[in-house]
Amino acid sequence: MGEVGTFALVALVGLLTFAFVASAVSGVARGIHWLSNINMVLAIVLAVFVFVLGPTVLILNLLPTTIADYSAQLATMSGRTAASAGDDTASWLSSWTIFYWAWWVSWTPFVGMFLARISRGRTIRQFVVGVIVIPTSVSLVWFAVFGGSAIGVQRDGTDVASQSSTEGQLFGMLDHLPLAGVSTVLVMVLVALFFVSGADAASLVMGTLSERGTRHPSKRIVVFWGTLTGGTAALILWTGGTDALQGLQTMTIIAAAPFLLVMIGLCVSLYRDVSRDPLIVGPTKESEHERVSDTL
């Protein structure tokens, strides 16, 4: 199969833009909620499929081992820089650790506000469990299933690691499992749905910011931001190809770097706010004294 042309990619961007704009306009309780549930069901189906038809015993053996190794090396790996090893490690760190963290910084305004929107009424404990503990646990299992399957295929003599991209490695691994055609289609559907469910949340947040923090931005504002986002990607892709789009991603991350200072300020603000919350601090000495005086 030959390489997909620019026109086909632009058409795909247009189709996905229409999908996430329609989802965003329908609101959190309808389209976004519906798509998110479909995403999770299909992801579970895919993970179970790979776990059952792949090297199940190897995956079960890798799961506790990798989690223990990850926990033991987390601090070391978090502080690792290019000075710790050679050029290959430096290249990997720049493309994964640094780039990936910077990418999440650029998504912080959208993800943070959207999580705050859907978490209204939850306790801090519920928020931490739902946003940090559960996603982290699911991610560990997910990487163990797919990483273990790829390792199993590699051990069997098929060199999937030599594929030029991570996408090629994924599809190369799926090709060695039964029903490869079905799983390949399922992966592509999942990628599209996860993109739509992320972009519709971003459109909704930009609409909220444009209307001074309202919880229900007008549909025309949401459509405007969604169309502008998709149109910008399509225009850059049409004029400069995938290289230009990657350049835009890099520029976005660089522009988002100053937001690290805002994130630090938000952490300090959250700590101060929580430390003064009456439900956490409890009654002050003054209020206790007043209560004792009233009793007497």
Where do the protein language model's features map onto the residues?
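Membrane-interface interhelical connector segments
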Residues: 72-90, 147-181
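Transmembrane alpha-helical segments of multi-pass small-molecule transport proteins
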Residues: 2-26, 45-46, 101-113, 219-234, ...
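Helix-loop-helix connectors at the membrane interface of multi-pass transporters/channels
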Residues: 1-10, 43-49, 112-137, 199-225
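Membrane-interface loop-to-helix entry segments
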Residues: 25-53, 62-72, 129-135, 249-262
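C-terminal transmembrane helix pair
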Residues: 132, 137-141, 181-205, 209-268
